[in-house]
């Protein structure tokens, strides 16, 4: 995929539906009684993996051009799959569905692509085992493939060593099948889409500080879900609009949940001209984002803000390379166990472009403001790497080439079309 320099990015976009919310809408709709209607669902490969898994467990899910209809069968309505559940590239599918499968009356196996087979699953196995679950890493390395034999589960009060919405959600979903109230305490609050949506479906989930608790055996009822635009997908156009001369971009109906809005806060700290318009809340808070070209400067990104922007850090690092001054990113060691080692991969790519960047154990230090040039960038099949460097390619001199650039289909199949539509 070749990307060339652009100026005057102008226009209006509706970015794809939020990936986290799309996954959860299908999962919770499958466990609800009645039909759940989902609009603005993300038709990316990861979310389609979730649909595939639940279809294999007997759930009727209809897809058409404008909506998804999930005909749920209740909390105990899933059927034993006749084949391995293929999660593809989706860590969210793997970790959340494991919590559900732990409480079923059947045995199932989960597997995915090479990336999934290297990502850490002990972080969900540990709390599930403490609840009495039977979950095994078939290669004995704490990674997929996993075999899960459903069993009666015990309630737990789990102290998670990582701030991870996937871990928290896995435990809360298993808690629906437990014998008492189950809770998860995190070191820092992670995204809270599970808590919001489970309550909307009829569960009793309470949150206090960094602890979330769920009562067992909830009766979930089918609902209508309007998925907001994904702020992680919007991030690329926020950055492109800020960095490309003469730009004005309006991003419509973007989710601005405070557990996800760290990108906006960092951009503001860097001097960004971003205006929120038409703010509203319908389950999740949303707004239109108006982006104008801005002169950016370095900042420090650390601490409690990290879980709110963990997926946006590759894009923030690219922004920092074009900004004046030094940007320090720390407390982000979680980047090492994403679809790629994003600390190493971002560092490699930016160095190829001529940036001054040093990796650290938990982040990176970027001395911005140097002229950057086109280069050949390896995406390592990581969609967020491909999109971050595509934005870099619209700003730097020369042509930037992205190896395996089509991996964007994981979360944003129309990404390149949308990017080029703004430059016309």
Where are these regions (language model features)?
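Structural preference for solvent-exposed beta-strand-turn elements
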Residues: 1-424
């Amino acid at each position: 995929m070749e990307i060339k320099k652009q100026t005057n990015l102008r226009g209006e976009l509706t970015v794809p539906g939020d990936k986290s919310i799309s996954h959860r809408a299908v999962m919770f709709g499958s466990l609800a009684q009645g039909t759940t209607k989902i609009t603005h669902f993300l038709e990316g490969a990861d979310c389609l993996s979730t649909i595939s898994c639940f279809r294999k467990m007997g759930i009727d899910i209809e897809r058409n051009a404008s909506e998804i209809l999930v005909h749920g069968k209740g909390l105990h309505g899933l059927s034993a799959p006749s084949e391995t559940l293929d999660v593809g590239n989706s860590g969210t599918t793997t970790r959340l569905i494991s919590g559900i499968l732990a409480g079923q009356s059947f045995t199932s196996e989960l597997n995915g692509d090479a990336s999934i087979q290297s990502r850490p699953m002990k972080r969900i196995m540990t709390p599930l085992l403490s609840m009495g679950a039977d979950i095994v890493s078939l290669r004995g390395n704490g990674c997929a493939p996993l075999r899960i034999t459903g069993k009666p589960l015990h309630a737990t009060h789990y102290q998670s060593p990582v701030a991870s919405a996937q871990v928290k959600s896995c435990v809360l979903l298993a808690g629906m099948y437990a014998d008492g109230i189950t809770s998860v305490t995190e070191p820092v609050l992670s995204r809270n889409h599970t808590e919001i949506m489970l309550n909307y479906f009829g569960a009793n989930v309470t949150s206090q500080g960094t602890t979330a608790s769920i009562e067992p055996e909830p009766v979930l009822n089918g609902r209508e879900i309007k998925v907001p635009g994904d702020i992680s997908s919007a991030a690329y156009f926020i950055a492109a609009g800020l960095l490309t001369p003469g730009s004005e971009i309006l991003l419509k109906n973007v989710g601005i949940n405070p557990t996800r809005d760290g990108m906006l806060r960092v951009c503001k700290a860097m001097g960004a001209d971003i205006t929120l318009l038409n703010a509203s809340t319908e389950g999740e808070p949303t707004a239109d984002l108006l982006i104008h070209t801005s002169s950016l400067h370095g900042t420090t990104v650390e601490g409690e803000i990290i879980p709110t922007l963990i997926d946006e850090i590759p894009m923030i690092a690219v922004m920092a390379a074009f900004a004046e001054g030094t940007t320090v990113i720390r407390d982000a060691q979680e980047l090492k166990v994403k679809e790629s080692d994003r600390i190493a991969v971002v560092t490699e790519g930016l160095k190829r472009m001529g940036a001054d960047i040093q990796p650290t154990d938990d982040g990176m230090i970027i001395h911005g403001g140097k002229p950057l040039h086109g280069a050949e960038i390896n995406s390592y099949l990581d969609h967020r790497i491909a999109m971050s460097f595509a934005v870099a390619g619209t700003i730097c001199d020369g042509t930037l080439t992205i190896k395996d650039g089509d991996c964007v289909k994981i979360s944003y199949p129309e990404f390149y079309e949308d990017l080029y539509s703004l430059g016309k």
